[in-house]
C-alpha cells in the first residue's frame, strides 16, 4: 500500500507532529509499504529519507508562529494526483479538510489525524464565549468526520470532542524512540540532590500560549520562595520567548537555544531531577513522554492528555504554581521515582503505534474493496 501523508503545521523546528510523521513513515516502510509525505518548505524540493519520499511545497508563512501553510488546492491536487497513493493520511482538520473529498472521488481511503483539541483552542485562543466555541468546534469536527473515512486521535482527551457528537474516533497513542531517549545513568541509584546540591528542573513544551509555559516560570518562583535551591532549563522556542525571558528575570531559569541533534537534547534533558509539563491542551504530550523515557519523573497538569501519558511516572496537579511546586517536592521524596518514570514510558512504542495505524488503513481498504 502506498500511503501519502500530508501535514501543514510542520517546520524545521516543530516537535511532536514532525516526530510522529517520521516514526510512522519509517515503520510503514519497514512493514513493506510505501510512504510519501507532503509538508511546507521554503521552496519546491523532493528528498528521499528514511520515512520515504518527502515533497516540500512552497508555503505562506504565518507571522509569529514559525509555521507556513500550503494554500494552493490546485497545485496540491495536481501533486497528489502525480504521487497516486492508495491511501492518504492528513494531519490537519482545517486547512486541508478538502483532501478527504479528493480521496473519495478517487476511490482511495482517507484518514484524518486530530493532533489538536479544537474545543480547547476555540475557548482559550479566541474571544468566542464557551458555548458558541463548543458549537463551532462541533461543526468543524462533524464536517471532518463526514469528509474522511476514519478519524484518529492520539489520546482519549483528543477523541472526546468527537465522541460527544457520536463520531467514532480511533485512539492511537504515539510512541518514543528508545534508542535515543534512554537513561544516561543508573536509575536504581539515582537519588534526590543532597543538601547543598542544586535541584535541576527541565520544562517540557513549546513556548506558545496554548502550552501555558508561564506556569513553569511561576512554579520556579514558588520553589525559590520556599527556600529550595533550584534551576530550570527551558529548551526550545516559540512566540512567547521574549515575554518569558522578561518574566523569569532574577529567577534561576536558563533559556537554551533550539537543539537540532536529538541525542544531544536527550543527554541534556536526561540530566534533570524533575520535569514540568504544563500544557493544558496537549492531545498527547510527546516531549513529556520523551523525558519520562530518560527516567525523569514529571509534574503535569490535570487538564488535557498529559495525565494519560504521565500516569504513574509522575504527579498530576492542578494548573497553579503552588500545586506544581508541591508536585516537584513530592517527586523529590518519592522512592524509585526515576525507575517508575522509565517504566511508564515503556508502555508507548512506535512499533505498536504504527501497527495500529496500518490496521486502520487496511480496514478502510477492505471496506472500499467489498
Residue ranges and their predicted role:
Residues 258, 267-272:
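Short alpha-helical donor nucleotide-sugar binding micro-motif in glycosyltransferases
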Residues 157, 175:
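Carbohydrate-associated surface elements
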Residues 4, 192-221:
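Conserved donor-binding/catalytic core segment of Leloir-type glycosyltransferases
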Residues 109, 120-143:
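Nucleotide-sugar donor phosphate/pyrophosphate-binding loop at the beta->alpha transition
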Residues 255, 311-322, 329-335:
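Conserved acidic donor-binding segment of nucleotide-sugar-dependent glycosyltransferases
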Residues 293, 297-300:
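Short hydrophobic beta-strand element within catalytic cores of glycosyltransferases
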Residues 242-263:
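Nucleotide-activated donor-binding/catalytic signature segment of Leloir-type glycosyltransferases, i.e.
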Residues 280:
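Aromatic "clamp/platform" in nucleotide-sugar-dependent glycosyltransferases that forms part
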